[in-house]
Amino acid sequence: MAAAPAALALDPQPQEEQKDASESSELSRLRAELAGALAEMETMKAVAEVSESTKAEAVAAVQRQCQEEVASLQAILKDSISSYETQIAALKQERQQQQQDSEEKERELGHLKQLLARAHPLDSLEKQMEKAHEDSEKLREIVLPMEQEIAELKVKLLRAEELIQEIQRRPRQPASLHGSTELLPLSRNPSPPLEPSEEPSGDAGPAAEAFAHNCDDSASISSFSLGGAAGSVSLRGPQGLSPEQEETASLVSTGTLVPEGIYLPPPGYQLVPDSQWEQLQVEGRQLQKELESVRRERDELQEGLSRSNEDCAKQMQVLLAQVQNSEQLLRTLQGTVSQAQERVQRQMAELATSHKCLSQEVKRLNEENRGLRAEQLPSSALQGSEQQEDQDEALPSSIQELHQLVRHTRQQARARQQAQEHEAERLRIEIVKLREALDEETAAKASLEGQLRVQREETDVLEASLCSLRIETERVQQEHHKAQLTDLLSEQRAKALRLQAELETSEQVQRDFVRLSQALQVRLEQIRQADTLEQVRSILDEAPLRDIKDIKDS
């Protein structure tokens, strides 16, 4: 009968070993999750660095290519100025739109911070942990006296068994039974209580996310719109005419600028000699070839510029896709954080309800224990006094009566011992259950606190990375926009200078043609007014009018 309590006392050891094994497995799983989160954070950092480097390289390459192409462009017309003004207005609108988008995102981030601040009731969690610690201390104070009482009951049972064995060994000495009940001293040396094991709570390191980030760059470099008829004044004729017809039409058009006092020859009369006419035709062909080469060069430059624009647009699309992926990852992480917080809150509510139930159960057991102690003390005192009176009144006078008395005493002791063992076993089982429930509750609270701490650290890291990414994106956008505006300003200045030079050149060429035609008309009028052939020859022997320099020299 004494071996049963010892076996029951050894039962919590395998349970504690199983609990340690489960805690070690849970700790290893948490470490694996931490390692995975750290690896994911490293990959996110690498992806962000690669995206930033590729973006900077792409922007630098596009800027270099645009500068090289813009430096080599020629023959820009006046109509491009209005188109670039509209493009600048569109860029300003895009900048305003980007500023509005950034303000909306900042408002969303502030709302998210408010939600996170509401979802982290740190003060209430600390109060609940302190309350749980106080409840565990109260349970320990209740369990220790119960264990002491159980130890005292065990000692009493052992003394009763020893007394019965002594009575069995000495059946022939009836006087030795007198006052046998006085040999039952009560031992008040309680056995040392078993302290509940404390479970370590592991702290997990911070984890990331990534990245994410929001980069709405717009890199659109417009192609130059080159018109054909406005820049080549007095150098080209209407389409569909031969070079000879173009030269004739140009001379006819300049004839309108001749003063009315000059005599006009009849139609069909040859105004220019054949050599000069051929020379003018050769010059016209050369100018036309140069114009065609300039057009081809312009088309090639436009194609190269369009290709560079397409490449830049593709690179910007790739960067935008990466930013969207990082934002999606951030949103998923925020969703998981919110779900984990809701789950933690539900588990805390369940633990609070279970804690209340356990406290009520402990109170009930305490009341039962007090009632049992109150019942046992009067019954034992009454039984002892009755036995003393019976033994004093009627002592056995024969061996048979002595045997009957011993048998009756043994049955009473056995029944009392069984009742006490059953009661002690029931109390021990309830104590073990309460201790296990308390340990589970403590472990659950520790794990929930660790998860909450990890989620809070991950949220802080993600918020910091999001802020840094947004700041970097805004800086890159401002630098890119500033570079675009600087390039556009330099292009507009260069275009204005080229257009001014072309306008002056075209006006000078027109004036030279007018002077040349006037000089030819004057020479022809002199020949027509000559009286003799010698005068005509002298006029023809003068310096030929092949260039405007001949007019200035003459």
Curated annotation (Swiss-Prot):
Cite a single GO MF annotation.
Answer: GTPase activator activity
UniProt GO BP: cell projection organization; endocytosis; protein transport; regulation of cilium assembly
Q: What ranges does the record give for the region Disordered, renumbered to this chain?
A: 1-29, 167-250, 375-395
Ranges annotated as biased composition (Basic and acidic residues) = 16-29
Q: Where is the composition biased (Polar residues)?
A: 377-386
Quote the biased-composition stretches of kind Low complexity, using this chain's numbering. 1-15
Q: Which residues carry this modification: Phosphoserine?
A: S176, S180, S187, S191
Which InterPro entries has this protein been placed in?
Rabaptin, Rabaptin_coiled-coil, Rabaptin_Rab5-bd_dom
Its annotated compartments are:
Cytoplasm; Early endosome; Cytoplasm, Cytoskeleton, Microtubule organizing center, Centrosome; Cytoplasm, Cytoskeleton, Cilium basal body
Q: Which residues form a coiled coil?
A: 15-173, 274-512
Any idea which UniProt keywords this protein has? Cell projection, Cilium biogenesis/degradation, Coiled coil, Cytoplasm, Cytoskeleton, Endocytosis, Endosome, Phosphoprotein, Protein transport, Transport
Task: List GO terms (cellular component aspect).
Answer: centrosome; ciliary basal body; early endosome; intracellular membrane-bounded organelle
What is known about what this protein does? Answer: Plays a role in membrane trafficking and in homotypic early endosome fusion. Participates in arteriogenesis by regulating vascular endothelial growth factor receptor 2/VEGFR2 cell surface expression and endosomal trafficking. By interacting with SDCCAG8, localizes to centrosomes and plays a critical role in ciliogenesis.
Would you identify the family this protein belongs to, as annotated? Belongs to the rabaptin family.
The record describes its quaternary structure and partners as: Heterodimer with RABGEF1. The dimer binds RAB5A that has been activated by GTP-binding. Interacts with SDCCAG8; this interaction is important for ciliogenesis regulation. Interacts with RAB4A; this interaction may mediate VEGFR2 cell surface expression.
What is this protein called in UniProt?
Rab GTPase-binding effector protein 2
